[in-house]
Swiss-Prot record:
The modification N6,N6,N6-trimethyllysine is found at residue 14. NCBIfam families: PRK04208.1. One of its GO terms (molecular function) is magnesium ion binding. This is Ribulose bisphosphate carboxylase large chain. The modification N-acetylproline is found at residue 3.
Length: 475
């Protein structure tokens, strides 16, 4: 950029354009405990130096603009500006690097993911000096995270509400996702819950369409839950999708769900938006509802390796905005997810304190202090043969969700649920006895299928089903 000019109060205002690195590249800066830290993967245009590109990211996501303005003299840029404090090359990439940026806490509204993202991943992603830009990770300091309510209830409170301990929870998305009448939909919910599942689920795009209005679906699903609970003696639930075109309509649906006495509602947090999601999370805590979160649209944001935002950032944002469950990939199913990377953001969802670990894509140590954890949901192209791997990978504090892997059972919905419950109980028992599920998992399933005809039928129909594609998002 040229020409270069500097604005100094002692000599008055000088108009013009200056290099961002003169103000926003500060390698000597020592980060503060209260700073929000960001790691950006930067691919600059040819000829743009790394220091200038990193400084441009810091400037355009905080106080900077393209030219010197006289109102700079009315405030303290040193207090409010973002700072690119470190740059490191990306191994194996010729013109790409990680730029570390520190933001002072005063730049952000308390308790607002919306404001946080508007600044950090706003206009800067369209900046012409950059060919591509990806936000890899954020460090949220306790001074900021404590301004958020976080999940409505969290993992331990959910287990206490359900009275279910020592194993993953089992779920199922009702299929076909669109086209069923409310009564037939409720029938499928009942059959799956009666067969042994803990939860059933609205698919993400089930809202209130002409073939099934939301109120009818809520009523028939509540009836199915009550009937299944009475027959099994277990607490059951169905994720009633409250996502709507307006926040007011969304809250109206959540209120009706509470009046029906169901334990959980659902929200599509990316398509619905963070403001709506935080509002719903507050309502759920105040009214005793669990909140299941679907991440529909995430791959538009996080799938490309060089541009967008990694899902670990969206996961952290969800923990602050509020949700008791969130879909997190499967590692073994039909949806994207490398094992180490997936387990990295699963820990960021569940644990209180997570150490920096670049081998898992965790760029910063994260301390959530007392914020409740979020239960990861494994869903998408999974079936009974995946149960040992899922149990071993995700552990007890997770939801394993089989849609087609339940309703695709050759004998019907209830036998499909039975097959999954038997497979899960067998895997948990084998693990508790000290068996290695990673090595002996298939044998555990075969042994269990000898005394469960439902599981045997499921094993037979899905024995050849695999989703073997290369993972796009690698470290």
């Amino acid at each position: 950029m040229s020409p270069k000019t500097e604005t100094k109060a002692s000599v008055g205002f000088k108009a013009g354009v200056k290099d961002y690195r003169l103000t926003y590249y500060t390698p000597e800066y020592q980060t503060k405990d209260t700073d929000i830290l960001a790691a950006f993967r930067v691919t600059p245009q040819p000829g743009v130096p790394a220091e200038e590109a990193g400084a441009a990211v810091a400037a355009e996501s905080s106080t900077g603009t393209w030219t010197t303005v006289w109102t700079d003299g009315l405030t303290s840029l040193d207090r409010y500006k973002g700072r690119c404090y470190d740059i490191e090359p990306v191994p194996g990439e010729e013109n790409q690097f990680i730029a570390y940026v520190a933001y002072p806490l005063d730049l952000f509204e308390e308790g607002s993911v919306t404001n946080l993202f508007t600044s950090i991943v706003g206009n800067v992603f369209g900046f012409k000096a950059l060919r591509a830009l990806r936000l890899e990770d954020l460090r949220i300091p306790p001074a900021y995270s404590k301004t958020f309510q976080g999940p409505p209830h969290g993992i331990q409170v959910e287990r206490d509400k359900l009275n279910k301990y020592g194993r993953p929870l089992l779920g199922c998305t009702i299929k076909p996702k669109l086209g069923l009448s409310a009564k037939n939909y409720g029938r499928a919910v009942y059959e799956c819950l009666r067969g042994g599942l803990d939860f059933t689920k609205d698919d993400e795009n089930v809202n209130s369409q002409p073939f099934m209005r939301w109120r009818d679906r809520f009523v028939f699903c509540a009836e199915a839950i009550n009937k299944a609970q009475a027959e099994t003696g277990e607490i059951k639930g169905h994720y009633l999708n409250a996502t709507a075109g307006t926040c007011e309509e969304m809250i109206k649906r959540a209120v009706f769900a509470r009046e029906l006495g169901v334990p959980i509602v659902m929200h599509d947090y990316l398509t619905g938006g963070f403001t709506a999601n935080t509002s719903l999370a507050h309502y759920c805590r105040d009214n005793g509802l669990l909140l299941h979160i679907h991440r529909a649209m995430h791959a538009v944001i996080d799938r490309q390796r060089n541009h967008g935002m990694h899902f670990r950032v969206l996961a952290k944002a969800l923990r602050m905005s509020g949700g008791d469950h969130i879909h997190a990939g499967t590692v073994v199913g039909k949806l994207e997810g490398e094992r180490d990377v997936t387990l990295g953001f699963v820990d960021l969802l569940r644990d209180d304190f997570i150490e920096k670990d670049r081998s898992r894509g965790i760029y910063f140590t994260q301390d959530w202090v007392s914020m409740p954890g979020v239960m990861p949901v494994a869903s998408g192209g999974i079936h009974v043969w995946h149960m040992p791997a899922l149990t071993e990978i995700f552990g007890d504090d997770s939801v394993l969700q089989f849609g087609g892997g339940t309703l695709g059972h050759p004998w019907g919905n209830a036998p499909g649920a039975v097959a999954n419950r038997v497979a899960l109980e067998a895997c948990v028992q084998a693990r508790n006895e000290g068996r290695d599920l990673a090595r002996e998992g298939n044998e555990v399933i075969r042994e269990a299928s000898k005394w469960s005809p439902e599981l045997a039928a499921a094993c037979e129909i899905w024995k050849e089903i695999k989703f073997e594609f290369d993972v796009i998002d690698r470290l």
